[in-house]
């Protein structure tokens, strides 16, 4: 018994040290908050530069916490957002960078942040031009969207982005169903601004398809 106590103490200390060393999702919370502020409150003409500034901050988190999927996912989200804001060849180059980072996160943990890497990667495949300019691929996009929904079937983002994709593919009835499901998604603690902005996007898209169907 006397030999067992030191062993148990050593195991406890190892577990405690590992828990203290493991990075927390809270590390990326400031990135999440700032991203939502840029997307939903900043003028469109300023967003590319603001996303660029934010990407530098999230890269620092990734560098300081290697193999931490949430940081890689948010790096991919921010860089892909900058790509969309810039457009053109510069945006395409950024989209390729975002794709690489998101793929890295999936190799580490495909379930991190409820499969958010699948959602963001699917959106890139859906919106980036196809060959020879880019890597866009509608079939690949749908495969990834379905994986994102498998990981987070009731989430606001996977349902919104897949619904938007289906509407772009002229599968309006299917797309409407996913948009309506996205509106019913449970609020995300600490993501109030992002949820509010996303719901507005959903409602706008639903109104657009309602008008188009008349």
PLM features per residue range, with description:
Residues 19-57:
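N-terminal leader/linker segments that initiate helical-solenoid repeat arrays
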Residues 31, 36-43, 81-90, 113, ...:
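Short coil/turn linking the two alpha-helices of tandem helical-hairpin repeats
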Residues 44-59, 91-100, 133-139, 179:
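Helix-turn-helix repeat elements of alpha-solenoid scaffolds
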Residues 56-63, 103-107, 143-150, 184:
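Conserved structural position within tetratricopeptide repeats
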Residues 66, 110-112, 153:
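Short coil turns that delineate tetratricopeptide repeat
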Residues 71, 114-117, 158, 192:
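TPR alpha-solenoid repeat register
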Residues 168-169, 176-180, 184-214:
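Terminal, low-structured helical/coil segments at or just beyond the last alpha-helical repeat
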């Amino acid at each position: 018994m006397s030999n067992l106590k030191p062993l148990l103490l050593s195991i406890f200390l190892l577990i405690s040290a590992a828990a203290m060393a493991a990075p927390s999702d809270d590390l990326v919370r400031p990135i999440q908050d700032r991203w939502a502020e840029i997307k939903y409150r900043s003028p469109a003409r300023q967003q590319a530069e603001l996303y660029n500034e934010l990407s530098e901050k999230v890269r620092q988190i990734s560098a300081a916490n290697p193999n931490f999927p949430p940081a890689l996912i948010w790096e991919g989200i921010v860089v892909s957002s900058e790509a969309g804001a810039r457009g053109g060849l510069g945006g395409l180059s950024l989209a390729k960078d975002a794709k690489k980072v998101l793929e890295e996160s999936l190799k580490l943990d495909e379930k991190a942040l409820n499969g958010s890497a699948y959602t963001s990667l699917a959106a890139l495949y859906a919106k980036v031009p196809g060959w020879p300019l880019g890597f866009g691929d509608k079939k690949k996009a749908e495969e990834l969207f379905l994986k994102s929904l498998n990981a987070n079937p009731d989430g606001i983002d996977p349902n919104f982005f897949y619904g938007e994709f289906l509407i772009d593919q002229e599968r309006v009835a299917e797309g409407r169903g996913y948009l309506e499901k996205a509106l019913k998604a449970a609020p995300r603690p600490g993501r109030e601004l992002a949820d509010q902005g996303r719901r507005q996007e959903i409602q706008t898209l639903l109104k657009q398809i309602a008008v188009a169907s008349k």
